[in-house]
From Swiss-Prot:
This is MICOS complex subunit MIC10. It comes from Arabidopsis thaliana (Mouse-ear cress). InterPro entries: Mic10 (IPR007512). Pfam families: DUF543. Signal peptide: none annotated. The keyword Cell membrane does not apply. The lineage of its organism: Eukaryota, Viridiplantae, Streptophyta, Embryophyta, Tracheophyta.
Amino acid sequence: METTKSNSSESDVNAKWDACLDLTARRFVYSSLGGAFAGLLFFRSPVTRWASIAFGAGIGIGSAYTDCSRVFDASSSTSATLLAAPKSTETSVSQAAEE
């Protein structure tokens, strides 16, 4: 019984780490792209363009760190679902026609 409980908690921690790494990678990339777009739009100097990319990347990593620390500090075991993508309840046109 104890081995299944430790295995369950280990898989829960692994799921949290997977969700946090996925969230961090996505926010890093999207924020860096946003910084690159803003840098191209507003700045002429390459130094300020790189600075805006770095600023965007820092915002992405910082927000991911905040969310991940909130997930790991939560007492419930369902906290990994906080990072999961929201499930859509909409039905497609073909599904609606079948019903």
